[in-house]
Amino acid sequence: MKKRWLASAIALWVLLTGCSAPHVQLETELPEDTVQAPEITPSPEIEQEVQMISGSEKLGSVTYRPDVVPSAFADGEKFSQELYSRLVEAIRQGADAADLSGVEATEAQFDGVRVFLLTRNPWGTLNDVVRDADGNAKITYTTADVQERVTKAAEFDDAVTRLLDAAVPEGSSQLSAAISLYKVVAQTVQQDNEAQDCRLYSALVQGLAQDSSFYAESYSFLLDQIGVENAVVFSEDGEYAWNVLTLDGQSYHCDAQTEAGLDGGQALSCFGLSDAQIAEKNGWNTWRSENETLLQCSKSLFEAVQQAPYADVDAAGCAVYFSKMEGREGVFRYDLNNGEVLEVQSVLPKQLAVLGENVYFINQDDQMLYRCRTTDGDLRQALENVPVSAIRRVGSELRYVTADDPDQTENVISMD
């Protein structure tokens, strides 16, 4: 069924639960009549085919699970859930050994779990895991200091807990949560060839990545936390890595490192791609999967959003806001439940980002920073009569530069 429709900001409706409001020390609330929503000028209607989108299933409250089994290996013959949980518990405690009595695991399963833990190294200090003569596990670390092991493990657990709390509000759909976590990785992990090689710990605690596998492995770990099936895939030479995620039986490519390199992760141009599209984006026509199962990605998730120079997610509202549709600039809302598109503001947005329950954008006409509330379409200046030259979201912060600042200092609007 096809629908044609176009609406103004006054008609914006979004069902939103559990979304924190942003805190802005410099933001000034203006009288209701100070800033009027710009009138919508006649323009061609947006024609969209309305359909259910993959991953529309709603999530409850997401709780960090350190021993969640990676979905890429959950059903394989080279992984043991019980063994993995037992080893994770010991490593997080900084123990030198793990009692494996009662654990039935083949050599192939032991090797599979060992390789996974060594390549991911979430808790930062693991050196190796081997079986001893009694069939238990001997664990060695990069430090002899047990307290340091425990401290680093706690730092990682705390970082992931905070990340999930901020990025995945209760009521998010699987898809909106997956997009939100993708944005976190693309916006907050920076490539640094000198970064300490401790994999997930380095990426999610320190925000540093040596290479693309750090991005892909971090995103994979976070997707497993929200129950989204996924796998890390590698280029033929093994030098580059990205993710394939599966929602409702349909698989898509996601490349957070390429996204980060384009504009600091401010768009969604590399999320939800088909096989043909990923080859265009990162240059790799063939790849292999970490679990030796190659999934076909036959179609794109939302091509219109991918083509916009700026796009951001309202995870709780299960929507994406983006800045360009069919060659026409504006502030648009893509419903992640059914694919419907709504024009929220008929303006020329210089840049766009979502923080909490507000969509922020710079109006090219007056260079002012506006915020449009997603719950009711209320439109105001975010900073009273202060021209702004640039904005970008990094995690739970909106960073902006005022137009008259010769030093281009970044100011911050943050979540409560």
Protein language model regions, located:
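Bacterial N-terminal signal peptides that target proteins for export
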Residues: 1-9
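Conserved structured core elements
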Residues: 4, 13, 212-213
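Residue-level detector of short, conserved catalytic/binding motifs and their immediate flanks
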Residues: 12, 241, 318
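C-terminal motif of bacterial Sec signal peptides marking the signal peptidase cleavage site
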Residues: 15-18
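N-terminal accessory/pre-domain segments preceding catalytic cores
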Residues: 20-172, 284-416
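Secondary-structure boundary elements
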Residues: 148-204
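Flexible, surface-exposed loop/gating regions in the mature catalytic domains
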Residues: 191-225, 242
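Hydrophobic/aromatic-rich core segments of domains that either
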Residues: 214-277
